[in-house]
């Protein structure tokens, strides 16, 4: 086996409660430009990297992997690049559905899919439905997503429930507010990884990462490999998660 998926590593991941990893996959365009290529080729290489990282997550018994594929702000990019990204998204869904089932992966999409074309929306629904009963890794894809959008959407759902007398306004607490977000059925995010050198969150899972550990690397996403992923996991192992409390040492 090429990857570091030893029993010791799996046990450490379980012991440290590393269950949900979220990745901001940044640097595809710059990777291509550095090589004198069009940005679209960088996204294609980024897809290849994503496949490898998903495999590594499966082999190491990570429960949930969230990938930031397309933000709501990404619509500001050139039209040709957006078209290429949508085509790549459709290709990825169509080409990987067999592997998702083979490796017992459940696909979940979060974000506003309404602007996507009908073929893409239908295929998203198809793949989510066909993998729904898979019990291994939950592959959570954030597409046309933003943290602010998620929070506002959650607030609107709460208002509707209050208006319908389903929920009393005094019952609204942090623990049940999370139930109104797109990640309601998922475990909290333990580790956020951002590639590409930037040190910001970029409107990603703003509510869900309140107590997440943050790992930033200068490595561009297409160059990010399983060893780099393991370095991020090893960094997580060094952290003492206090969740607002004090050190127990």
UniProtKB/Swiss-Prot annotation:
Enzyme class: transferase
SUPFAM superfamilies, A to Z: Undecaprenyl diphosphate synthase (SSF64005)
Co-factor remark: Binds 2 magnesium ions per subunit.
One example of a Gene Ontology biological process annotation: polyprenol biosynthetic process
Active site annotation, chain numbering: 26, 74
Keyword Transmembrane in record: no
Signal peptide: none
Binding positions (Mg(2+)): 26, 213
Molecular-function GO terms, alphabetical: ditrans,polycis-undecaprenyl-diphosphate synthase [(2E,6E)-farnesyl-diphosphate specific] activity; magnesium ion binding
A cellular component annotation (GO) from this entry: cytosol
Sequence positions that bind substrate: 27-31, 39, 43, 71-73, 75, 77, 194, 200-202
Name of a matching Pfam family: Prenyltransf
Keyword Electron transport: no
Domain of life where this protein originates: Bacteria
Cofactor(s) required, per the database record: Mg(2+)
Protein EC: 2.5.1.31
Reactions performed catalytically: 8 isopentenyl diphosphate + (2E,6E)-farnesyl diphosphate = di-trans,octa-cis-undecaprenyl diphosphate + 8 diphosphate
Family according to the record: Belongs to the UPP synthase family.
Function: Catalyzes the sequential condensation of isopentenyl diphosphate (IPP) with (2E,6E)-farnesyl diphosphate (E,E-FPP) to yield (2Z,6Z,10Z,14Z,18Z,22Z,26Z,30Z,34E,38E)-undecaprenyl diphosphate (di-trans,octa-cis-UPP). UPP is the precursor of glycosyl carrier lipid in the biosynthesis of bacterial cell wall polysaccharide components such as peptidoglycan and lipopolysaccharide.
Database matches in HAMAP family: ISPT (MF_01139)
Subunit structure: Homodimer.
Protein name listed in UniProt: Ditrans,polycis-undecaprenyl-diphosphate synthase ((2E,6E)-farnesyl-diphosphate specific)
Source organism: Buchnera aphidicola subsp. Schizaphis graminum (strain Sg)
Gene: uppS
